[in-house]
């Protein structure tokens, strides 16, 4: 009897963690045919098809987050609105598979000179925030950290100082020095920017290190942008990336489910 040889990646048979960073594009009537109501089902389809352990979203208004919460029953989320620390403004929420993970500790801080209170920092055009969680794998008992953010699109000083603050806060928050750390977000900066110098001393780049990867752009501007802007990133530590993928395929119900493509990282634990 011949053995069946199946084309299943080796990592698919092992203990992995899948992380997706997704700028879902805020809910605004100015997007014409690309308004949230026309693509919200496609965002849900993407999550159900990709089945990430962690879905880290940016630009999510509460109405959008509430829709995801109600239509993705396998997930729970942490995160607050950046404009008031409650439901106001955009959320950098972390959705996690509740069958596999539980929250041990979580929090939020603002990217400003006064990070522990709702505030706008430096030359930023908007309030900016980081949501983070310390999670326990219910099956293995292992722990990990996940941080999610969105840097300012205008303030150059704000982006630079924000990366410094994030790097420092990760050092302060992470007590479990052996636990995997994931940092996701829309950084509004190419990885070649020198703003990342302090962060690269602490965390590594999933896109660069994964043996299966791509070099595709992540910002599409609803099709108007040249596919060269790589501004969404996944950083990590204490894990082994085996796959990085820009989810730009027309397989979720419409060609563009946001003005950013989701990015996906798969890591061996």
Which residues does each PLM region occupy?
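Bacterial N-terminal signal peptides
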Residues: 1-7
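N-terminal, active-site-proximal structural segment of metallo-dependent hydrolase catalytic domains
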Residues: 11-71, 84-89, 164, 269
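Structured beta-strand-rich core segments of catalytic domains in phosphoester-bond hydrolases
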Residues: 54-143, 246-248
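Metal-dependent phosphoester-hydrolase catalytic domains
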Residues: 157, 161, 168-181, 188-269
